[in-house]
Amino acid sequence: MAKDHAGGPEDLERLVRDLIAEVLEAYPAKAQKKRAKHLSVAGATSEDADASRHRVEMRHVKSNIKSVPGVLTIRGCAYAGSKGVVWGPIKDMVHISHGPVGCGTYSWSQRRNYYTGKTGVDSFVTMQFTTDFQEKDIVFGGDKKLEKTIDEINELFPLSKGITIQSECPIGLIGDDIEAVSKKKNKEINKTIVPVRCEGFRGVSQSLGHHIANDAVRDWIFEQPESEATKAFEPGPYDVNIIGDYNIGGDAWASPILLEEIGLNVIWSGDATLAEMERAPKAKLNLIHCYRSMNYICRYMEEKYSIGWMEYNFFGPTQIEASLRIGKFDETIQANVEKVIAKYRPLVDGILAKYKPRLEGKSVMLYVRPRSAPRRHAYDDLGMVIAGTGYEFAHNDDYKRTGHYVKEGTIYDDVTGYELEKFIEKIRPDLVASGIKEEKYPVQKMGIPFRQMHSWDYSGPYHGYWASPILLDAPWDKPHRASSWKITPAAPWKAASEA
């Protein structure tokens, strides 16, 4: 609909509003009224000085409020935001899923946080640890079981540098004192132990889990006495932290290549250790990739240690160049930036020459986490049109900060599986970039190319100049472009009735 519409902006806006109204008709009146606040139209308001960019007005989009009970939300919980996002990539710490086995099992190794090291010896990212709560633990409390689990981990994995306790819902409901257990075991085994109150019922999405995890980093890492290794670390004038990049598909290995080429030294990144986290306050600048999940700790470090921070985006040539140029240290770094940009210019020209003729003017719909939002720039550089976009757990400021990247189209917040499917059916974009829950398989069944933007779908990295072909190739050339329903034999009962 959006990509083929030849009328003016007013006609397009009317069509999109009609589409939203049509989708909402499936709900009861009360749910319909609530969901209507999350769906809106991005309409042009004025031109920037740069005529190629439009300003859009984010009209009446409500965000960061509770999902409507009974609808199939694509959000996660606070536990997912803490364990799965912020703490999960810290590779030499053991992360205990404290509670029933299910939460840890279903979140086991989903994030594709790549790491160096020997699994089970000095790295534990892909391993699952749980206190396996049973009914008696709910009744009598689980503090003793937690203590025993910590002792077992310390005995079985002596090279682990620390432990985090990721609380599941029952822990908060029964009132277990995980902070007291952490302090006690810290003295006994002399390792960092971090209690994280990330029970899934807290907040409205995984976003509060990010905030809680950031606070745990502040309280149990940064505000503790410095370790001997941190005291011995000698900071340099060009030390930077890469924050909010969780090394999905190797992204955190790709980004430092460019940063080190311009003369910066990365001391904390997505392939992280506890020691790197501890020395993070010694950096000169924080480079934040996922603003929504890690802006809290960046703001704290700015206030406490006077470390500035800036957002960066290594998706697509235009934003890579802008990000390299904005982080100015001195004339030496600035000169290096221009040399690096010139070095990769032939590669960029080759990528644009290969992909732009076949992709320019094609439409793409996005439904992503705020971390994935910058991916739109890779499509923008190729002249693709954003037909619809939205976030799972964004706050109002996320829409305000990123609204100018979206041309006229549909805006959806905390969209349900039903709504997203109906929008895609009606708009029929050339590409959908979203997640794996209620998004990936319905879209592929429609025969629409799909790019999985949460864990890179066994692909990656997507950061850097050389990553563009990895991001752009697969959706267009794989067999799943054909609708699976067209090649699947009819169900036996249908075949019998047709005969």
Swiss-Prot record:
Binding site for [8Fe-7S] cluster: C77, C103, C169
Binding positions ([7Fe-Mo-9S-C-homocitryl] cluster): C290, H454
Coiled-coil segments: none
E.C. no: 1.18.6.1
GO molecular function: ATP binding; iron-sulfur cluster binding; metal ion binding; nitrogenase activity
UniProt GO BP: nitrogen fixation
Details of cofactor binding: Binds 1 [8Fe-7S] cluster per heterodimer.
UniProt keyword Iron, yes or no: yes
Alphabetized UniProt keyword annotations: ATP-binding, Iron, Iron-sulfur, Metal-binding, Molybdenum, Nitrogen fixation, Nucleotide-binding, Oxidoreductase
SUPFAM superfamilies noted in UniProt: Helical backbone' metal receptor
GO cellular component, one term: molybdenum-iron nitrogenase complex
EC top class, as a word: oxidoreductase
InterPro entries: Nase/OxRdtase_comp1 (IPR000510), Nase_comp1_asu (IPR010143), Nase_comp1_CS (IPR000318), Nase_Mo-Fe_asu (IPR005972)
Cofactor: [8Fe-7S] cluster; [7Fe-Mo-9S-C-homocitryl] cluster
Catalytic activity line of the entry: N2 + 8 reduced [2Fe-2S]-[ferredoxin] + 16 ATP + 16 H2O = H2 + 8 oxidized [2Fe-2S]-[ferredoxin] + 2 NH4(+) + 16 ADP + 16 phosphate + 6 H(+)
Family membership noted in the UniProt record: Belongs to the NifD/NifK/NifE/NifN family.
Subunit field text: Tetramer of two alpha and two beta chains. Forms complex with the iron protein (nitrogenase component 2).
Function: This molybdenum-iron protein is part of the nitrogenase complex that catalyzes the key enzymatic reactions in nitrogen fixation.
Name of the protein described by the UniProt record: Nitrogenase molybdenum-iron protein alpha chain
Gene from which the chain derives: nifD
